[in-house]
Amino acid sequence: MTEKIFPVGKLPVELLSRLLAQAPVTDPRVLQGPGVGLDCAVIDAGETLLVLKSDPITFATDEIGWYAVQVNVNDIATAGATPCWFIMTLLLPEGQTTAGLAEGITQQVYQACQEVGISVVGGHSEITFGLDRPILIGTLIGEVRREALVTPRGASPGDRVLLTKGVPIEATAILARQFPGRLEDVLTAAELEEAQGFLYHPGISVLRDARIATHAGQVTAMHDPTEGGLVTALWELAEASGHTFVVDPAAVPIPPLSRRVCAAFELDPLASIASGALLMTVGAEDAARICRALEAEGIPCSEIGVVESGPVAVGRRTASGLELLDRPERDEIARIFEG
């Protein structure tokens, strides 16, 4: 019997769960190992905890070094940790690689790390058979005090669900940078430039968001919505915590420019790669204070739902009960790259 071939994107969650459950974790110092919705590993290093993350850049080719640092920083930030040490693996395409290409990507990584105070401590590079574009994989290690650790498992019934900035910031930037010709009839030249600039403003980093939020009140869980967008991130938090997430899709902030870009490609903005927004659950009594603290620093924050006791689920309330939000099988922009 022929095995099913999976499309571009994350592995099906059932397969991924099965694979991760088989991972050998025998060291008692591993406080958090692999699991669906768990952004980072956590290791007991004595006085502090080490937080580790690995993430590739596969959709974008423009500013790939910048992307690689930011997406790894984001996951370290969602643990409440400080990013410290970066390791890069750079796979370059055969028949296309020049000194300028290798130097350009490497300098992007160095600059992005310097801006956040990260040391680049090692890695690997090669020209790889079969690639048609560069692939960059980053591994980032951070530190956090034991009492300051935030994990995706921390959400509890009654917590409020908050989202910073809006979605999908990253998809907007990628589509505008990779496929500008397909937006020429939809956006003005100034609007196209603005959409391309979403990489930096509002930006795909959530490091400031996480630091401000955790200092302002009780943050019980944080997550960085990447592939599969906000809806996938909500499902991952629900699975990690074991609870039901009830959300109001109409309350999710979508920048007007993002809405127009997604419409031009016929994409669902809630299921498109969304780095730049911080998804978090917070104590009900702290929700307003955390939002005010973020907004005082120029970071919009919206309450989009609540955590309830019940089975793992993500949905919206209707007159007939909880209507589940379908979990995306893959990120929306994968269709564009395939086409």
Task: Report each predicted region and the residues it spans.
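Acidic, Ser/Thr/Pro-rich beta/coil linker or hinge segments at domain junctions
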Residues: 3-17, 295-339
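Small-aliphatic-rich amphipathic alpha-helix that forms the alpha element of a beta-alpha
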Residues: 61-87, 104-115, 208-212, 232-236
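Active-site-proximal betaalpha loop/short-helix elements
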Residues: 93-97, 197-274
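Beta-strand->loop->alpha-helix junctions that form or flank phosphate-binding loops
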Residues: 32-35, 225-226, 244-253, 271-273, ...
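Glycine-rich anion-binding loops of enzyme active sites
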Residues: 44-57, 82-182, 306
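Helix N-cap motif at beta-to-alpha junctions
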Residues: 282-288
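Extreme N-terminal cap/leader segments of soluble proteins
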Residues: 1-60, 79, 88, 110-118, ...
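General beta-strand structural signal in soluble alpha/beta enzymes
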Residues: 32-35, 44, 51-53, 119-123, ...
